[in-house]
């Protein structure tokens, strides 16, 4: 039978699943009331369990033309609706609805306008709104006109919708808006604001922006003010120039408060083996000078930067960041693209960084494994590692002969409880020697954590070592 809904039902005592099957005829009023005795308890609909994506005509008639006018889900609070051409909106869009997530597939968008009209008239209390719609489409104006009637939003997220200047201005004037995500900023945005009407998001604490080009995001930031934003996340596809990256960070300094910003994430999202040669030819290198504008934000706790650039940061560079942000919780640099360097941070530099930032819970850097062979002067007894840490070593090169020294060092420093990873980035598999590096690191992490036993390096002949070797081989494959 064709399933219509798979919904999570929650009341004071239990959570369970309701499945509503196809109708072969219109239900009468008694049958409808029996059905509503169950559906009135539904607070949340998380989607549609319809493998064929389409509903038969009898079911549509039954749902959209019931014998009574009362809504089918009178107490519905949250709705995530995905991939249907026809939505029985009149019985889903109710005044109790406060959270709405519409996820349309290609070809589904003709149903959008009718649904938005019903939502606009029957759902005055929506506070959390998300719309994902595939491009190309012609519904930008329709959606903008609809959102302008929403004045109580606390969170708004969109993907695939291009907003005009009037829409940006409207969002900035919603007094309750705390979270905003605009993940489809055009390459050449046509926005113009007068000095008297420039958008100021005075209540916004979380802002996410995405575009093909970093310059487009910079353009929007330059036209707005985010005086209390705490979390700023920027995603883009194309590899930015050095000038574009510098301009972006400079714009952030002028747009955001130096005191309120806690998290900054600047991440390229497009990774391809076929782009590697083109991107490497750019020769861009991330240095301390590129990151220095971020140091104006004195309360930063989370810094995530991922670019299709080489990384050229030294021990002293990271310690300079640590001195500025001693309470830093996460520092993630090129966790997907890699550092693309034969060097990296030395063991001494890593330990000094961990000592300076005892609150670190996430760290992604590249290290020089040859430095682990030398004695760790000054840290044998006095080193206090952060209590828990997810340590990613990015694309750090490793020699098989250094595996034993690395295991001994990590164990001596009390890092056995750490979560380790290396060579897991999407774009690292095309680097020469990636498979062997990942293999060797998995041996290191396995022995440090106590997962593997037997001779270090997997050279033993006992049965447990053979099983460990097979396990490492499986984990080393992409």
Regions found by a protein language model. Give the residues of each.
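Leucine-rich repeat
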Residues: 1-478
């Amino acid at each position: 039978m064709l399933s219509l809904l798979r919904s999570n039902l929650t009341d004071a005592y239990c959570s369970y699943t309701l499945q509503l099957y196809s109708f072969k005829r219109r239900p009468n009023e008694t049958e409808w009331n029996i059905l509503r005795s169950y559906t009135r308890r539904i607070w949340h609909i998380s989607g549609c369990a319809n493998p064929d994506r389409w509903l038969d005509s009898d079911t549509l008639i039954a749902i959209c033309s019931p014998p009574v006018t009362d809504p089918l889900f009178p107490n519905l609070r949250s709705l995530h609706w995905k991939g249907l051409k026809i939505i029985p909106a009149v019985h889903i869009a109710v005044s109790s609805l406060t959270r709405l997530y519409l996820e349309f597939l290609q070809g589904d968008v003709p149903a959008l306008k009718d649904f938005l009209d019903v939502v606009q008239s029957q759902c005055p209390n929506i506070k959390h709104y998300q719309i994902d719609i595939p491009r190309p489409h012609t519904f930008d104006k329709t959606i903008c006109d609809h959102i302008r009637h929403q004045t109580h939003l606390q969170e708004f997220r969109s993907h695939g919708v291009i907003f005009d200047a009037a829409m940006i201005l409207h969002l900035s004037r919603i007094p309750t808006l705390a979270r905003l995500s605009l993940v489809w900023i055009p390459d050449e945005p046509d926005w113009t604001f007068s000095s008297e009407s420039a958008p100021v998001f005075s209540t916004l604490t979380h802002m996410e922006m995405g575009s093909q080009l970093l310059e487009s995001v910079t353009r929007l930031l330059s036209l707005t003010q985010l005086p209390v934003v705490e979390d700023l996340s920027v995603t883009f596809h194309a590899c930015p120039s050095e000038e574009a990256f510098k301009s972006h960070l400079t714009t952030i300094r002028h747009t955001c408060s130096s005191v309120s910003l806690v998290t900054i994430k600047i991440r390229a999202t497009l990774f391809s083996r076929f782009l590697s040669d083109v991107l490497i030819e750019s020769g861009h290198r991330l240095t301390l000078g590129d990151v220095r504008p971020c140091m104006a934000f004195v309360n930063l706790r989370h810094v995530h930067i991922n670019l299709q650039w080489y990384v050229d940061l030294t021990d002293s560079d990271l310690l300079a960041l640590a001195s500025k942000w001693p309470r830093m919780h996460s520092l993630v640099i090129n966790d997907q693209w890699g550092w693309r360097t034969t060097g990296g941070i030395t063991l001494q530099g890593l330990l000094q960084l961990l000592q300076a930032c005892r609150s670190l819970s996430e760290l992604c850097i590249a290290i020089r494994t040859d430095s682990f062979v030398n004695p760790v002067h000054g840290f044998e007894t006095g080193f206090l590692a952060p209590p828990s840490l997810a340590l990613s070593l990015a694309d750090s090169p490793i020699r098989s002969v250094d595996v034993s020294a690395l295991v001994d060092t990590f164990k001596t420093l009390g890092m056995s409880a750490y979560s380790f990873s290396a060579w897991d980035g999407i774009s690292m598999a095309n680097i020469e020697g990636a498979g062997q590096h990942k293999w060797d690191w998995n041996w290191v992490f396995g022995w440090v954590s106590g997962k593997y036993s037997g001779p270090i390096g997997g050279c033993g002949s006992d049965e447990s070592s053979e099983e460990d070797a097979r396990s490492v081989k499986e984990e080393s494959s992409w």
